[in-house]
Swiss-Prot record:
Compositional bias per record (Basic and acidic residues), positions renumbered to this chain: 22-31, 44-53, 716-755
Residue segments, region Cyclic nucleotide-binding domain: 530-646
Protein's name according to its UniProt entry: Cyclic nucleotide-gated channel beta-3
Cytoplasmic compartment residues: 1-218, 271-299, 336-348, 446-809
Pathology noted in the entry: Stargardt disease 1: An autosomal recessive form of Stargardt disease, a retinal degenerative disease characterized by macular dystrophy, progressive bilateral atrophy of the foveal retinal pigment epithelium, and accumulation of fluorescent flecks around the macula and/or in the central and near-peripheral areas of the retina. STGD1 patients typically lose central vision in their first or second decade of life.
Spans annotated as Disordered: 1-121, 153-178, 698-776
Sequence segments annotated as region (Selectivity filter): 407-410
Family indicated by similarity: Belongs to the cyclic nucleotide-gated cation channel (TC 1.A.1.5) family. CNGB3 subfamily.
Protein's organism: Homo sapiens
Functional description taken from the UniProt entry: Pore-forming subunit of the cone cyclic nucleotide-gated channel. Mediates cone photoresponses at bright light converting transient changes in intracellular cGMP levels into electrical signals. In the dark, cGMP levels are high and keep the channel open enabling a steady inward current carried by Na(+) and Ca(2+) ions that leads to membrane depolarization and neurotransmitter release from synaptic terminals.
Polar residues compositional bias, start-end: 32-43, 55-88
Biological process annotations from GO: monoatomic cation transmembrane transport; monoatomic cation transport; signal transduction; visual perception
Length: 809
């Protein structure tokens, strides 16, 4: 409701009210001349009312009578400060002394009369405005109160609560009481703090899930489990057959068995249920899911079967190792350890050879145990075939197993049926096992040397090709050098073939680790999108250059950018192109301007030669344009940088122009002043020689004018004009003669003139300097015809000077 009321109560500014009142007073004075005395008295009354208002003004409250509020509001409306006074304490104080409209004579009409302006706002609006002022005042008081509470803190009561007493020194006393509880012990010369049991248990606490592929601690645990498994596989058959377990050493065997059982049990209860697995492409790390997955797997069944305590039968049947045969069922951990170990080794084929050799030795160990059992069954020393009981039992039986499996002759013939059947089975198993191991060994060694065999095959094919086409020996030597260096440095011929089998994300990760630090240093690519640089890393190609190979030659069109990965290159220059200007090392970049240059700016400006073996990364122009299609912001940045680099390149090229032919006989000229360049640019078709001649003639003319007077100066000017006209005619005739001699039309030469005088820079070219040196100083009857023709060699021209006699006039 207040909003609608305040919108109606619009008050005009004070200045406008004053102007209206003054105009109304003038009208009244015009109609009533006797009102001047009344006007002065009215002004005095207004001043008196203003003083009384200033002394009696008080803040408006909700308890004031309505009559007082209405009187104050009427005065405020007359002063024009109803809704613009922000001070809540002086809400009823007027800011002007303009007389109220009510005091005017109702019979008088003026600009502010009721007929000329809308009717005044009703009293209810004034009351609402006063209420709004009161509301603003209370809101400000409330804001100040809450601000004070925020600064001083929220108090529960208006009375200040007593300050809380400072904490006593009880906690330090407790800390001092706890300090003596810490225990220390000395280790040699060091004082070591004894860790509490709870802290130690926290540190050795197992994680909720274990990544079997990346966790190295899990790999160490698998090594411990594998050792326990190998102990059982080797010594259970040995203790079962050979008489090595006796009553004197039985307690040692039992201790070793208990340790192995503890390792098995701990692995089954605490390690295997925490291994992560993949289901539907997601890695499962939830503890409940991990335990459920392990309990439903075949590995859990084998682990339970391997830990069944058949050792209890020792109480009824004695210490027979046969009851521990189920410990050999935990073979899954053994193969898992082999798989993880091969995945982290640099040369896994070495471990594969060792593992295959271990398989062979273990089979021979089992065969030796079986042979001793057969000899004991037949009776030791009863026949020539069985073990005779002499020497070390295990070594003699192992020797017999080696000769049997490898099918070495010279063994005693079996005598009984049991011996014959046993020997036949032994021969068959020996041939099968031995051939399998030999084949596996061949595969391991073949896989280890597969890359080298491929390298040898490629090199042999290339040499055969070169011999077939009678390639020179020097070229063949360079080809062999490239093959040998590539193999020695990379152990492969083309590393891109290896990366093709990997996914794009893995290729990008490898490229970032190898080449990102190099390409991020290129000034041309600084400020570009990082993703664009990542895309370029995937497109880089590695190229190997031999010592003395030209990476790029001067004058050829540049289509690639080069980044030095390994080695050095030299930039050659000078008159003969053999001077080393600079040597670029690993991490340097060259040729980047050619990627973005256009209109002839992409030509190579120098020869670049590999100083030694140089491995360079290349990026061609086409590939860069394909990448920039998706990165318009980076393209704008690259284009801007390319223009700056091209300008710098043009300045350096202008600073050292090439000197050819007759220009080599004269010293290089100084740089042309800017003022002279401006003058030369505005002369149109005038040549440099003509300007110099005019300058000398003007100097001579000034000297003659100072000596001979003004008349002689005028005559000299006329003569000078005549000489210039004659010189123009002679030049035109000489050009016509030149065109006739060369069989050209006289219209071809003027077409070439605008090209020579198109810009002031053309004045600095060498042909003009040569023309200046050979022009005659005085008048002669000889004319010089100078022409330039392209040479057979790229980047060179042939200067031709012909001398002809002028015709006599």
């Amino acid at each position: 409701m207040f909003k609608s009321l305040t919108k109606v109560n619009k008050v005009k500014p004070i200045g406008e009210n004053n102007e209206n009142e003054q105009s109304s007073r003038r009208n009244e004075e015009g109609s009533h001349p006797s009102n001047q005395s009344q006007q002065t008295t009215a002004q005095e009354e207004n001043k008196g009312e203003e003083k009384s208002l200033k002394t009696k003004s008080t803040p408006v409250t909700s308890e004031e009578p309505h009559t007082n509020i209405q009187d104050k509001l009427s005065k405020k409306n007359s002063s024009g400060d109803l809704t613009t006074n922000p001070d809540p304490q002086n809400a009823a104080e007027p800011t002007g002394t303009v007389p109220e409209q009510k005091e005017m004579d109702p019979g008088k009409e003026g600009p502010n009369s009721p007929q000329n302006k809308p009717p005044a706002a009703p009293v209810i609006n004034e009351y609402a405005d006063a209420q709004l002022h009161n509301l603003v005042k209370r809101m400000r008081q409330r804001t100040a109160l809450y601000k004070k509470k925020l600064v001083e803190g929220d108090l529960s009561s208006p009375e200040a609560s007593p300050q809380t007493a400072k904490p006593t020194a009880v906690p330090p006393v407790k800390e001092s009481d706890d300090k003596p509880t810490e225990h220390y012990y000395r280790l040699l010369w060091f004082k070591v703090k004894k860790m509490p049991l709870t802290e130690y248990l926290k540190r050795i606490k197992l994680p909720n899930s274990i990544d079997s592929y990346t966790d190295r601690l899990y790999l160490l645990w698998l090594l411990l489990v594998t050792l326990a498994y190998n102990w059982n596989c080797c010594f259970i058959p040995l203790r079962l057959v050979f008489p090595y377990q006796t009553a004197d050493n039985i307690h040692y065997w039992l201790i070793a068995d208990i340790i192995c059982d503890i390792i098995y049990l701990y692995d089954m209860l605490f390690i295997q249920p925490r291994l992560q697995f993949v289901r539907g492409g997601d890695i499962i790390v939830d503890s409940n899911e991990l335990r459920k997955h392990y309990r439903t797997s075949t590995k859990f069944q084998l682990d339970v079967a391997s830990i069944i305590p058949f050792d209890i039968c020792y109480l009824f049947f004695g210490f027979n190792p046969m009851f521990r045969a189920n410990r050999m069922l935990k073979y899954t951990s053994f193969f898992e350890f082999n798989h993880h170990l091969e995945s982290i080794m640099d040369k896994a084929y070495i471990y594969r050879v060792i593992r295959t050799t271990g398989y062979l030795l273990f089979i021979l160990h089992i065969n030796a145990c079986v042979y001793y059992w057969a000899s004991n069954y037949e009776g030791i020393g009863t026949t020539r075939w069985v073990y005779d009981g002499e020497g070390n039992e295990y070594l003699r039986c192992y020797y017999w197993a080696v000769r049997t499996l490898i099918t070495i002759g010279g063994l005693p013939e079996p005598q009984t049926l049991f011996e014959i059947v046993f020997q036949l089975l032994n021969f068959f198993s020996g041939v099968f096992v031995f051939s399998s191991l030999i084949g596996q060994m061949r595969d391991v060694i073949g896989a280890a040397t597969a890359n080298q065999n491929y390298f040898r095959a490629c090199m042999d094919d290339t040499i055969a090709y070169m011999n077939n086409y009678s390639i020179p020996k020097l070229v063949q030597k360079r080809v062999r050098t490239w093959y040998e260096y590539t193999w020695d440095s990379q152990r492969m011929l083309d590393e891109s073939d290896l990366l093709k089998t990997l996914p794009t994300t893995v290729q990008l990760a490898l490229a970032i680790d190898v080449n990102f630090s190099i390409i991020s240093k290129v000034d041309l690519f600084k400020g570009c999108d990082t993703q664009m640089i990542y895309d370029m890393l995937l497109r880089l190609k590695s190229v190997l250059y031999l010592p003395g190979d030209f990476v790029c030659k001067k004058g050829e069109i540049g289509k690639e950018m080069y980044i030095i990965k390994h080695g050095e290159v030299q930039v050659l220059g000078g008159p003969d192109g053999t001077k080393v200007l600079v040597t670029l090392k690993a991490g340097s970049v060259f040729g980047e301007i050619s990627l973005l240059a256009a209109g002839g700016g992409n030509r190579r400006t120098a020869n670049v030669v590999a100083h030694g073996f140089a491995n360079l990364l290349t990026l061609d122009k086409k590939t860069l344009q394909e990448i920039l299609v998706h990165y318009p912001d980076s393209e704008r940045i690259l284009m801007k940088k390319a223009r700056v680099l091209l300008k710098q390149k043009a300045k350096t090229a202008e600073a050292t122009p090439p000197r050819k032919d007759l220009a080599l006989l004269f010293p290089p000229k100084e740089e042309t002043p800017k003022l002279f360049k401006t003058l030369l640019g505005g002369t149109g078709k005038a040549s440099l020689a003509r300007l110099l001649k005019l300058k000398r003639e003007q100097a001579a003319q000034k000297k003659e004018n100072s000596e001979g007077g003004e008349e002689e100066g005028k005559e000299n000017e006329d003569k000078q004009k005549e000489n210039e006209d004659k010189q123009k005619e002679n030049e035109d005739k000489g050009k016509e003669n030149e065109d006739k001699d060369k069989g050209r039309e006289p219209e071809e030469k003027p077409l070439d003139r605008p090209e020579c005088t198109a810009s002031p820079i053309a004045v600095e070219e060498e042909p003009h300097s040569v023309r200046r040196t050979v022009l005659p100083r005085g008048t002669s009857r000889q004319s010089l015809i100078i022409s330039m023709a392209p040479s057979a060699e790229g980047g060179e021209e042939v200067l031709t000077i012909e001398v002809k006699e002028k015709a006599k006039q």
